[in-house]
Design a protein with these regions (language model features):
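Conserved helicase motor core of SF1/SF2 NTP-dependent helicases
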Residues: 1-81, 85-167
């Protein structure tokens, strides 16, 4: 009998992109929320705020910083680690050892966008170690085509400057 996944867990490291935000006021949740906001935004877009909130309350969806994964064994789950280029080798090892029975993991990241102060990304390291192992796959996306880039730049210019003469 195939077991169903009981929950979806989304996580990412709490690493700032280039600039230091410094002290954040509030409780622990309000301190980590800014790092998790992109995950919340994506879920709101896919599910709608009300449906997302219901799934969160039922425990079907969990969004947590990577640091909260230590010590857990995650069975019957589908786990997504986002921005994995910003994990250290130690964090990546900790994350991968959370894998429990009937669990699938998806790890996303771009090794050209590392924000770590010590630029040894756990993502780049695991690819060298795990490449070629059965049931583990790595997918590399190609950069956007030059034609798309021109389209994007032109669309942005039109959007930005449209209406400037209306003043």
């Amino acid at each position: 009998r195939d077991k169903q996944v009981n929950r979806i867990i989304l996580t990412r490291p709490a690493v700032e992109a280039g600039e230091r935000l410094g002290f954040l006021p509030g409780d622990l949740q309000s301190k980590v929320d800014p790092y998790l906001r992109p995950l919340y935004d994506a879920l709101f877009d896919m599910l709608g705020a009300e449906s997302f909130q219901k799934q969160l309350e039922r425990g079907n969806i969990e969004v947590a910083p990577l640091a909260y994964m230590r010590g857990r064994t995650l069975d019957d789950s589908f786990i997504i680690l986002d921005e994995a280029q910003n994990t250290s080798v130690e964090q990546m090892k900790m994350f991968l050892t959370r894998l429990g029975f009937n669990t699938k993991m998806v790890i996303t990241g771009d090794v050209t966008q590392v924000d770590l102060t010590v630029p040894k990304s756990g993502l780049a390291t695991i690819e060298r170690i795990l490449d070629g192992i059965d049931d583990i796959a790595f997918a590399h996306l190609k950069p956007a085509a030059p034609d798309f880039r021109i389209f994007w730049d032109n669309a942005y210019c039109v959007h930005t400057f449209k209406g400037e003469g209306d003043r």
